[in-house]
Amino acid sequence: MRLTRPSLVSAASIAAVAALALSACGGGDSATEASASSSAASSSRLVVATTVSPITSIVSAVAGDNVTIEGIVPEGTNSHTFEPEPQAAELLNKADLIFINGLKLEDPTLQLAEANKKEGAEIVELGTIVLPESEYIYDFSFPEEDGKPNPHLWTDPGYAVTYADIVRQKLTERDPANAAEYQANFEAFKAEADKLAAAVSADQASVPQGQLKLVTYHDAYAYFAKNFGWEVVGAIQPSSFDEPTPAEVTGLIEQIRSQGVPTIFGSEVFPSAVLEAIAAETGVRYEDSLRDDDLPGAPGEAQHSLLELLRYNYRTMISGLGGQPTQLDALVFERTVPDTAFYPQ
């Protein structure tokens, strides 16, 4: 599995791109402008920009083929440290709607969007809308003193449905002619997400009592764990997203031993020699195949979706903790909406 390195763009670059975008809008060949104006007038198709692949997948599931959807954050990238290429400003300048997670996850992309969005465009921070501050989760990877709560709501299928409903509302406001289709697509997505939640609830009951405990590379399951009755013991990736200090490693080893954690979970997207060494030191099983935000399959394939990603990760965790994921294995998603979104790789 590839490991995509984040690109870097400075605040000065953001300002320069914004200036270029403004000058491009105000100048240029009149024939070119007339052609562009004619092209825009001839098409009422919405243009939507998204950030991480789970959000792109949700938007696509609701929008169907009525909307042009393009993601910004490549799959397999650490979304917390990702900074967009300056050319992302061009997409953001064309978009009618810009869907991001919010909760401080994509601040550089948000800054670029605010500097370059066209008049009338809307930036929709899904997580910030959904989660009241009283329900923010702060922990070892997201300490409260840093002011950035854990942003990973979409790993819980219930929150994924709430995201999808907001997407439906925003698309309907912009494109009321297709409101019935957006509603039908949302209801189909909700039905599949509800089946997934039911399968997880059934299968986690097969995990030996007291073993629904998570130690992961990336701290992505806090809201899922809270709502499904799991315990997040720790994560190897600290708030700085650098390698953990020796003291942090020692503390995590002590937690694993004292709480009887049976398995620790790494990521096939972000291999961790430190987590592997912790497993060897504690003698617990090491399962290194969680996919984080990297959707399975290739864009356009049926398995390339958020729900399939969640099914895969839930299955990996339940089996790794000694359970039997029989309901997850038997689950068949009835995908009727084509995914025509662009997912950067």
Features from the language model and the residues they span:
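Extracytoplasmic metal-acquisition and chelation regions
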Residues: R2-I14, A21-Q345
